[in-house]
């Protein structure tokens, strides 16, 4: 198969999330875990971006003037708060229903986000580039991880960053992030994640490195049931985040 014929889209996954689109902004609905996860990932994005671009973390709009792509944006749970930080955000998702929900919510909230029902490869082919590419909780739902990462990397400008968050392919992750989360705790609908589609860190790092990016940070993320919060951790066996940078 030629690269031109390759696709990152898993239509079954697109249909699955489209069917739940109306629940994106419900903090007690099917996307409750993402609402819980948002504070820790937003803080990580803000802190690492500010360090890279020489910004003040305490500023109300620390990402002012930066162009950001939120790929696989869903209903916009990440796009909106990043836009509130001052960034010019493009929220991209292959689901028309997700983009419709995201656009309606952003308009009602008065937050400017450029939402588009497009794929990563369509954006890359159009020559789009960004200071920051957010690839958060997406790679475990795409059809071709290597091609997806390579495509996203193409859009990172010199000196720019790519953030990736996903679930590791380990037995520990299978037990906690799939079996417990979907069958016991009922945090997620059954079938949200499939073990064979989970991604190990090296499977992300290899295509990023091949695309000229340097991996500058790795961190685990865990849920503390006592505080009811997600926190950064050195344990990357389940949830983790990676940060890549294209040299200036």
UniProtKB/Swiss-Prot annotation:
The alphabetical list of record keywords is: Methyltransferase, S-adenosyl-L-methionine, Transferase, Ubiquinone biosynthesis
InterPro entries named among the record's database cross-references? SAM-dependent_MTases_sf, UbiG_MeTrfase
Q: Short name of one Pfam family for this protein?
A: Methyltransf_23
Top-level lineage group: Bacteria
Q: Extract the GO molecular function terms from the UniProt entry.
A: 2-polyprenyl-6-hydroxyphenol methylase activity; 3-demethylubiquinol 3-O-methyltransferase activity; polyprenyldihydroxybenzoate methyltransferase activity
Please give the pathway this protein is involved in. Answer: Cofactor biosynthesis; ubiquinone biosynthesis
Q: Where does S-adenosyl-L-methionine bind?
A: 41, 72, 93, 136
> Key word Nucleotide-binding present in the record?
no
What's its EC?
2.1.1.222, 2.1.1.64
Taxonomic placement: Bacteria, Pseudomonadati, Pseudomonadota, Alphaproteobacteria, Hyphomicrobiales
Top EC class for this record: transferase
Q: Which family is it part of?
A: Belongs to the methyltransferase superfamily. UbiG/COQ3 family.
Q: Which reaction does it catalyse?
A: a 3-demethylubiquinol + S-adenosyl-L-methionine = a ubiquinol + S-adenosyl-L-homocysteine + H(+); a 3-(all-trans-polyprenyl)benzene-1,2-diol + S-adenosyl-L-methionine = a 2-methoxy-6-(all-trans-polyprenyl)phenol + S-adenosyl-L-homocysteine + H(+)
Tell me which Gene Ontology terms the entry assigns under biological process.
Answer: methylation
| Task performed by this protein | O-methyltransferase that catalyzes the 2 O-methylation steps in the ubiquinone biosynthetic pathway.
Q: What is this protein called?
A: Ubiquinone biosynthesis O-methyltransferase
Organism of this sequence: Rhizobium etli (strain CIAT 652)
